Every structure is written in structure tokens, then in C-alpha cells.
């Protein structure tokens, strides 16, 4: 928007209008003319009149009748009559009398126009036609402008002085000047709760010359922008004009006390009105401890800081005036009870403008001024440092203590939300690190929930907006306080290596070969070769320039000087990281001497590594593997890569032996993740590996499924390494050798499963293994009988045991109830002490022939006593019953049974198709306790599964035995595509006939469908109950070998099973039964009979339609067909007689 400005004509006879983006400045005779950029809006009528008056007063040749103050665009003079001034005076709501108009030679119509309030012809069109201006239009204009007065401030601002100088005390982030008008200043007064004389900080009034004092005018100036301008008045101005100017001068410079409505302007230029009630609510809602004192009411006696609420005056830089400031103070004294607060710009504080301040009355306003002084001092220091200038000012903190004593406040040295000696935050619309770290003050209420950091101001809608990283020079030139991020927060950036701006190069790519200690170490000094992890923290660097020794303590000081917080970078923290950094760099120099040449272990590299670790751990909150485990944020069973840093033999007098479990071996090792370390206990097998030299210092281990002993609460790794009570429990099944270039810490990739033939039976839990399911056995039930005794039953027998157990319990309980009912009369006679009257009534009704008639004649009190006693009696009786039944059942051995279901699965190891060696897979049996329903139904024979949570059982058998819990183990099937990469392992179930039973090796499992020829009686043999069953399948009739057509099956149970339930009922004779999972035993050559054993996993089915025995369905049908033949009956009879002769029975009822 263009700016119009009045300038004197070159001839000096008049004035002219010009459009200028740069407004010239009035200066004294000794000061050259300067040009200032301005973005001031068009001058108001009050500005024009004030400019015209000042110019008229300055000119000596002005005539009383006409005043050539304005000129047209062509340079023609525009006559300004005194009657026009009177009209303008009436427009501005001034009191105009007829005498005034007469003195201005106004005509009668003009007097009428002035006297008339409805039409005031102030303006004219280009053709000379008058434009009437009504008072309603003026009221609308005043409502739009937000003020009912043209000028409403205690003093005239420089922009309104008529000298064409912009009052640009404030600047935006884009270096654009912000003009402050008198109305805006009045709104600021209303917003900040200031009084009438509180705006003298903006006046910068200088004493004028004697000529200006004669007429009561004073020059207006701003600091370092323009000098004082003296306005002279001609003493020979005739008539009432001099009186008018004198009266207007006082009216313009001393406006009324009415404050206009408060308005704000958005970045787009829109004006927003804010009522006093809204401002009051905002002040109560915000409650900002830093700027809240701006909104406090001075008349209420509130102060910025009180000893109860705030004690931090000592951390505010204060300068209570200086003799070299060059500012002139007002000598006026206010008559108010309280000295009002002075709102001061952060650029130029009032203590730098006034040389004399009454400290006794600055209870609240003085503290605010000192805040701004601190901001200005901080800015001056930053500017002087930028230009290389030295600043010899004294520290303002000393003055802060003195002023706090005068004001009666207690200085406070520390504030939780802000560091000491910190200036006020620069409230500009820039997002830099200084504002980003300006967190919420601790005195405010903390708000829960998600926190979003946004800029408090809108971005200016201009194309020249500069990002915070590109406008450091602009901030310095604007004079705003530049606050560095280290003064606002302890999270100062110490290292620029993180986040990495380019991909990191790891040791495998950098060195390219395995670390090997060469015999030639010309580049490695002796003191470097002697560095170990145990003494690396005591290593010191020798400064060649001096005799100083640089060790961990020196690096602690270096970090503190770099801005690190000693709360985080403590002595223990620095010593710990110094130890691992020195050891790592020394190993590089030792094992890669040709490439390193001793340039890795240097002071610069160590310091940079410490800064890098501080940046990641403190500023970014990253934690290493060991720190996360000790803090409880990650389980110790996670897969990670650690390095052996030391081997510590465990003595017999070790006091920490009790803290480790039985798996703790005679040797402990120290493991590190490069940042922290902790002890680890090895199991027996790992100890053997250590003694064999397969574990050594510097070796990396891939650990999975480790345990944690001695840990109860989150612990710091610096404390855990000292206490030695917490240790990792390592086992060989979860510990593998890692590659020399693997990164330390947690592993992101999935762990490789351990092969079944690599599992050690005493090597601890197996984190993960891959195997195929060869057989799934039926559900079994294990009952614990106490005293470490137990018995295993099949599902069929368990159901019978449950039925028999419940029958026995029911019979026993019925007997107890009958006996209890017979002894009921003697029971209640001894328990009538609770209610004598109720007991008597109860006995009476119990023996009465017609108790209903007796109850009808009872009073309500008697009925109530009877009911109460009866309820108590029945409750006690029920309790006695339950107790008596429980005791009787327990004595009879019929208490609650402790039965746990389980299932067994036979596994087989896998062999890759690419393997060229001998194929000898290892087999194992897994016992799943309390299997889930999904495991019972979804596990399938012949599939490959990824299994987790298996624990091996120590056994000398060639078969590996493992166990797992159904809820904690995981069975994930392998995809068919991946299963094709392994050699076949599964032989499907198929029925075996007696004719080819000789092809099966001994101790092998087989399934058969057979005809039951004879069922023997159960007998006891060596603490076992046995029962023999003889079967045939008819295959001998086709082969003609009658001698090999019998199979004797032995069923056995434990002797502790005192149940009378037999495995095979005699009723099964003559039926076709399917037997699964029978074990082949040696053949009875004497009697020419095949022998098999039914173990715990063996099961039989009468119905061939069962899912488990579906593969026997066809053979069962053939046997039934064969048994119905007439020729087969003689064969069956002959076989039965043969069985009786073998067992020694002459005759059997079942024959």
C-alpha cells in the first residue's frame, strides 16, 4: 500500500503531497538527513491537522486570513482558511462558539452549518460539491476504528507528531516494522492493566529549546532513529488562531482517560475485538508465571513475585539504570497510592530510559523492568560477540539482589522450569531450538494426554518468510533477545554424528578381514598392548604439549564444558563408557596395526565417542540391551549378541553363591554390549567348552533364552556391575558362537532353530527347534498319589476310574447323611445357648403333633426368635455335615483326585536335501502337559513344525526326551513349500498282518486289526498287574501256517492301581478289535507265538470308524468276513484249545 506524505515546497511557500515508500526524517541542522523504511498507514485527519498546525507555527510568513498548507498534484496551492479549521474543530467534537466563528470571518450559513449537528459539510467532491457528513457517520467511523476519540494516549507517539517518522519500535520475524499508534497503545494499556502515566517508556521526550517552551511544544524522538525536532511558532500570529493553537495543543497532548475497546490484528490484517470480560477470563485461564504479572491489577496490590510463590529474582539479569544510557527522565510525580506498572518494550526497557526511579514504589513494576533489562543485556552480548566487540558491562545479577532487597522480595537462585541467568523468551513467530525447548513451567498444572508442539503464532503470509535456520543475522539486527537452547534445556546437542546423515560403515566393510593379532606390532606401543577391559578405565593419555595426564576425570570436565548435564553424565557414567571406548579403540589398534597405525586411540576420538553416546542415550533416550534388561523393559530371553570381556573364576568363599540358581557353574564371565556389562553364569556344558578353549575374551556370543537370577526391581547397570548379585544364566542350548562382525545388542532378525541332534539333554531350555511329527499318541492321564508316587492311565480306564470313584463317594456320603439324621436330636439339644427362647420353641415344635396350630398362636417376637434360631441351627448343621463328609472321604481315600492330562508326540530330526552325508536322523519324544484344545485337534502327523518352549530331560537314552506346557509352548507349522527342502521322514500308518509281522524289527511299533480268541485273567507279577490277550487275523489260513497264526498281547498296569478295572473285558472274545501302537517283542519260539506289548501309549478300538484307527477299517472288515465263514470256526476253535494248553488251563467258561 502506497504511503502519502507532506513535504515542503522547494520554494518554501507551501506544501506538496508525494507518494513515497521511504519517509524522510526531520533532523536538526547538524545531523544529515536519513531515510527510513516505513510501512505506516495513511495519516488520519488528526495527523493532517497536527502536521498543518506544526508547519504553520514553524513558518513566519503565514498570513492570518489564509494559510496555504496543502498543494494539489500539479503543485497548485490549496488555501486553508480558519473557517475550515473551525469546521474541522466541530467535526472533532470540540466546543465552537459563535465568537470563534466570527473571529474566523465565517459567514452566517457557515455558522449555521457549524451549529447544525446533522449536516457538517467537511468534504467536497472534485467538482466542488459539498459532501454532508452526519454525526451518525462519524459514530460509525469511530466504532469501526475502535475509539471514540481521535487521539487517546497520554502522550503523542512519534508517528503522530507530524514529522513523517515511523514509530517502528517493533519488527516481525521477516524484519518488517510494526507501527504503534496512539489507539493501539491505549488498547495495550487496557490489555496489560496499566494506568495513565505508565506509557512514558514510549515517549522519549526530550526537553525542547526555549522557543518551543514558550509555546508549550516539545520535540518527540525515538532512540537511535531520529534526533529531537524543535517546532517553532511565530509570535506574531494574530487573532484567535494563537489561542486556538494553544488550546488544541493541550487537548491533543492531554487526551481523555477513556480507554478504547481492545482489538487484535491477525496475520491477514483482520481486526478482532476483545471485550474486558473475555480478557479477564483469559487472564484467569492462562495464569502464565512468566508474563502473568502483566495482567495483574495494580490497584489490587498484586505483585509479580512473593516469597510464598516465587523466589527467583536472583536468576533474572537486572540493570537498574545506567549513567551512560543517555535517556532523559520525567520529573513528574504521580499522586496514586501505588506506583503503576510501566509496560516496557523488550527492546528498550524503561530502566535504560530513566535515570531516576523511585525504587520504594516499584514493588511489582520494577521486577518486570528488570526482566526486560536481562533480555536486552543478553541481546547486546550476542550482538557484540557476533561483531567481535568486547562488552565491559557489569553483570546485572548483583543489581538484581540489591533491587530485590529494596522491593522486599526474597531472591531465588534456582527455578525448576528455567536455568539461572536466563532472559525472557523471545516471543516471535519463529520456530527455533530456543522456543522448542521452552517447556511448560512447573508452576502450571500439567495436562495429561498427547502433547502437540505447535508454533504460538501464525506464519506471516509473505513470500520473504525465512526459516529459523536462515535468519540468524535478521534476529541479531532486529534487536530481539537471542536465547540459545542450552540456556533453556539440558538437552544440548553435543554430537552431530547422530542421527547419521549418511549410512554408517561397519567393521566388516571397513577392515574386511577377521581380526588377527600379528606378531609384528611396530605401530602399537607397549602401554596400548597392555590395555584390557579390566584396566581400560584407568588408562590415561599423555599430553605431549604438557606434562598433564588425560584420564576419565579430564573427559568428565570436557563433557561438562561442552554443555553436558552432570546429572546424566555423572562420574560413574563417564568412567563406564570411557572404559569400553578405550578398550574398543585399543583392540582396533592392536588387531589391525597396519591400517590403524595407532590413530584410533586418541583423545579426540574418545571425546567424540563420549559425546556420541551422550547424544544417543541422554538426548534421544536410546538404551542398550543390558540396560533395557536390567530396567525391566526387555526380557532376558530375547536374542542378543554380547561379547566376553572378562573371565572371573568363582572362589569357594564367594558370598554371592546363594544368589544364583543350581545352573550357576563354577565359572562366571563378564559380558558386554559395548555400553554396559553384567555377569553371566555358565552351565556345566558351557564350562567344559570354556575349559577346552572354545570360549575366550573378545568372542561374540549369540544368546537366546537366557535366564535372569537375582533381579527383583529395575536396577541401573552401573549398580548391577558393582553388586554382582544379578547375573545372566546361560545354557549351551541357547548359546551359539556369533560372527566376528555381528553388531552387539538385540538382534532384529529371527533366530535360527537348533537342530534336534544338537540339543543337549542337560543343556537347558531349547529356544527354538525344527522337527517333524512322526507319531501322535492318545491322551493319557497322570494321577499323583502323594509321596512322589503316581500312576498313568489311558483315557478309557480314566473314565472308568472316575465313574467308580464317584460311585464310592456317593455311597459313603449317603451313609454319613443317614447317620447324621439319626443323631440330629442329640445335636441341637447341646446348641441352644444362642437363643434360649428360640431353642425352646424349636424343641416344642419338633415334638408337637400339630406344630401349625402352635405357630398360629405365637406372637411376632416368638416367631422372630424361632426363625433366627432355625437359620443359625441349619447353617451350623450344614457346616458340620460338610466337614464330617470331607474328613470321612479323606480317611477312606476318596478325596479330590490330582489328575493331569498329557499327550506324547514322537519327533524326528530333519535332513536338508543338499546334505551329502549319512542320513541318520535323531528321534525325540515330547510330553505336553495340559495340552490346549488346539494342540489336541490341529497337530497332524507327517508335518514339520517350528517349536518353542521345549525343555530336555537328562537321560542316557538315544531318544531325546523333552517336555513342555501346553499354554507356554508354541507349535507353528512350516509351509509346504519350505517343507520340500528336507528329505522325507514320515511313514504313514498301515495295518500289519501276522503273515508279515516278521518283517518288522524288534521294539518297533505297529498297528493291527485282529479277532480276539481268548482273554486271560489279570494277575500280579513283580509289582505289576498283567493280563494276556490272544488274537488272530486269519492270514494263517491263506498261508497254511497254523503255527504262526497267534499273537499274544501283554497289558500291564502299576501295582499301585488298586482298581478292579481290567484292560480287556472278557466280553470282547469273538470280536474284531483294532490295536494301535503295539511294541513288537521277541517271538515265543517254543510255542510258536508272536509276542507284543501294549505300553502306556498303546490303545485299542472296538469301532473301526474312529478317527485314530481309520487306517484299520479295511482290514477289520476282511477279518469279520473271515470269522463268519464255517471253515473259520474250526480254525478258531483249534487256536483256542492251543492257547488253553499253553496257559495250563484244562477248561475255560468262555470256550
UniProtKB/Swiss-Prot annotation:
Name of the protein described by the UniProt record: Protein BREAST CANCER SUSCEPTIBILITY 2 homolog A
Primary role: Involved in double-strand break repair and/or homologous recombination by mediating RAD51- and DMC1-facilitated DNA repair. Plays an essential role in both somatic and meiotic homologous recombination. Is crucial for the formation of RAD51 and DMC1 foci during male meiotic homologous recombination in prophase I.
PROSITE patterns the record matches: BRCA2_REPEAT (PS50138)
Free-text tissue specificity from the UniProt record: Expressed in flower buds.
Pfam families: BRCA-2_helical (PF09169), BRCA-2_OB1 (PF09103), BRCA2 (PF00634)
BRCA2 repeat windows: 63-97, 116-150, 163-197, 257-291
Gene designation per UniProt: BRCA2A
Disulfide bonds: none
A single GO BP: meiotic cell cycle
Annotated keywords: Cell cycle, DNA damage, DNA recombination, DNA repair, DNA-binding, Meiosis, Repeat
GO molecular function, one term: DNA binding
Record InterPro entries: BRCA2, BRCA2_hlx, BRCA2_hlx_sf, BRCA2_OB_1, BRCA2_OB_2_dom, BRCA2_repeat, NA-bd_OB-fold
Organism of this sequence: Arabidopsis thaliana
Phenotype caused by lack of the gene: No visible phenotype under normal growth conditions, but the double mutants brca2a and brca2b are sterile due to aberrant chromosome aggregates, chromosomal fragmentation and missegregation during meiosis.
Coiled coil: none
